[in-house]
């Protein structure tokens, strides 16, 4: 009271505190002696002379200007949720009791003597071991075709009486014991700790048709990459998405038009298993999006010694819209594609952290997973307290980017407004402006000004490669505008020619030829002496083996033609006419690519005279 005034902080909810403060102030003033009261009154009068609008308005204007500046800064930031006041709990009587549905899985038991077949069927190692695949096929050849060459479904559907017969078949047991022994010895090989560990991110993995998470060459390369890593004992962890419908199965309609057939996948019948947390619950990661949190479950697909972790959003914790994110490979509109790539990149990084995996190198197979750079940088800045520039150096030094597409149309690009909807908060976490964030995925002379995922992946990578020598040359031209003033051949974009996984793509007939030639059951690709023996093969043997395989190919084509044409109600006369003109001795040219526009299928007819 001696100062002549009291300042009370008044809000909408502290009325009692304000009243108590005023009462206390008045009480103390009344207890003053006359001299103290006179001095306090004099100070109060002096304060009243300066507390007028002529003096205070300048401060009011300054406060208003400051508020406008802060409002402008918050424009690019996600809005805070409104503070919710606690209210008295209200009991709402439900008109009915909603049923609670739970999944129940019934597992068939195998005879103890061949119980290890369940373990063998759960690891995709069988998909590139021809003897293991033939072992499952011979259990029931007809059923094997019906279940789509899926041993997990085979063991669920096969008649138990047949299993009992097999468990007493000495020839079958000798073969199955030997194959299982090879499998366990394969997995027991000590890991090679001298090479760096790698996290391999890809939108698709082509490992086997029973796991429908691929559509073309990019996925097949990724699948072969993991298989070869397993064979070579390299420490690689795969990160991808698990799709409910995957890519469509193509059929031809009555008029020859394409029909896309989507078939929902039952995750309990494919070679994946849920990843559990410490409490035995399905492990999930989450991303915060506008007004909601999206969760993704983790699944493990063992690929020999390599672990492939797959994420999916199709479960009850998510909204109907978000459950559909991982329904289709490359499905939906541009916004759904962005969601998929956020799940793959940011969600994939959070999955690695949840699993306790700390790779030395991060490999992006195409630009779909480029958001891993944002999430890694956020971690380095927020948790390791590094600057943006320091974080960029660390990320670039440990990131590799493989590009596949030689034309601009094949590279994903998104509108700025769409990105602002989902990652508007990231620039503040990286201590940069929104424009600086956008510049990471743009080119200065890009008239569309879209955010290009391949540009982002390029800027986050120290090494970048095409998939052939020619493609490397084309890619240097395609990305050269990111570095104006440099010559094409001065760029750090190289090439690694695509290869294939030997055991997946070499037919058993050729394996028998190589075994007879080298005297060894398995052809060692790193043994130059074995390669030298290839030149000892007689031309007749090469031609004979090739024609044997070609005949098998044409038999399969006739079989598929018959099945497809009967469904289209094609006349038997037409079917017989087509089948009779298929000649395995004729030169046959096939176009084994998807008919997407940027694939340029019209190149087939570019030189008709030569064709």
Where would I find each of the regions flagged by the language model?
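Catalytic cores of carbohydrate-active enzymes across secretory and cytosolic contexts
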Residues: 1-611
């Amino acid at each position: 009271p001696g100062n002549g005034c009291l300042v009370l902080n008044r809000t909408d909810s502290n009325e009692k505190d304000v009243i108590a403060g005023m009462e206390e102030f008045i009480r103390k003033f009344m207890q003053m002696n006359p001299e103290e009261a006179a001095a306090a009154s004099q100070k109060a009068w002096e304060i009243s002379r300066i507390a007028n609008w002529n003096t205070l308005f300048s401060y009011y204007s300054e406060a208003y200007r400051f508020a406008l500046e802060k409002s402008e800064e918050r424009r690019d930031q996600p809005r805070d949720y409104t503070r919710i006041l606690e209210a008295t709990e209200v009991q709402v009587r439900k008109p009915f009791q909603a049923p609670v549905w739970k999944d129940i899985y019934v597992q068939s038991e195998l005879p103890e003597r061949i119980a290890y077949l369940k373990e063998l069927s759960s690891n995709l190692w069988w998909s590139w071991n021809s003897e293991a695949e033939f072992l499952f096929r011979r259990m029931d050849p007809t059923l094997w075709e019906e279940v789509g060459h899926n041993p997990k479904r085979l063991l669920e559907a096969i008649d138990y009486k047949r299993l009992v017969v097999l468990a007493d078949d000495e020839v079958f047991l000798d073969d199955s014991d030997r194959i299982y022994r090879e499998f366990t010895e394969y997995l027991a090989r000590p890991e090679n700790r001298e090479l760096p560990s790698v996290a391999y991110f890809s939108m698709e993995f082509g490992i086997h048709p029973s796991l429908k998470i691929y559509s073309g060459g990019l996925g097949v390369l990724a699948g072969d990459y993991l298989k070869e890593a397993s064979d070579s004992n390299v420490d690689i962890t795969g990160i991808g998405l698990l799709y409910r419908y995957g890519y469509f199965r193509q059929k031809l309609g009555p008029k020859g038009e394409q029909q896309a057939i989507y078939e929902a996948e039952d995750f309990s019948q494919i070679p994946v298993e849920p990843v559990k947390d410490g409490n035995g619950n399905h492990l999930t990661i989450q991303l915060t999006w506008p007004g909601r949190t999206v969760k993704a479950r983790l699944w493990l697909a063992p690929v020999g010694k390599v672990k492939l972790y797959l994420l999916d959003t199709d479960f009850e914790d998510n909204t109907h819209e978000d459950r559909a994110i991982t329904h289709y490979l490359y499905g939906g509109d541009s916004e759904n594609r962005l969601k998929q790539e956020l799940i793959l990149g940011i969600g994939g990084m959070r999955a690695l952290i949840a699993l306790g995996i700390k790779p030395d190198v991060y490999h992006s197979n195409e630009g779909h997973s480029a958001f891993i750079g944002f999430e890694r940088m956020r971690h380095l800045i927020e948790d390791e307290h590094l600057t943006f520039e320091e974080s960029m150096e660390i990320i670039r030094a440990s990131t590799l980017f493989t590009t596949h597409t030689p034309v601009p149309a094949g590279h994903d690009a998104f509108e700025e407004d769409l990105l602002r909807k989902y990652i508007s908060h990231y620039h503040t976490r990286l201590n940069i402006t929104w424009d600086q964030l956008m510049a990471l995925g743009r080119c200065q002379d890009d008239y569309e000004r879209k955010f290009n995922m391949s540009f982002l992946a390029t800027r986050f990578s120290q090494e970048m490669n095409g998939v052939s020598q020619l493609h490397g040359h084309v890619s240097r031209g395609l990305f050269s505008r990111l570095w104006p003033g440099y010559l094409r051949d001065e760029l750090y974009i190289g090439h690694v020619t695509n290869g294939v996984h030997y055991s997946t793509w070499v037919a058993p007939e050729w394996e028998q030829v190589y075994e007879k030639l080298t005297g060894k059951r398995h052809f060692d690709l790193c043994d130059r002496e074995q390669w030298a023996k290839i030149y000892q093969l007689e031309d007749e043997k090469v031609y004979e083996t090739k024609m044997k395989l070609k005949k098998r190919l044409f038999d399969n084509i006739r079989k598929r033609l018959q099945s497809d044409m009967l469904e289209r109600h094609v006349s038997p006369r037409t079917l017989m006419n087509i089948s009779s003109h298929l000649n395995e001795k004729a030169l046959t040219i096939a176009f084994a690519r998807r008919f997407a526009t940027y694939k340029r299928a019209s190149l087939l007819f570019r030189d008709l005279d030569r064709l």
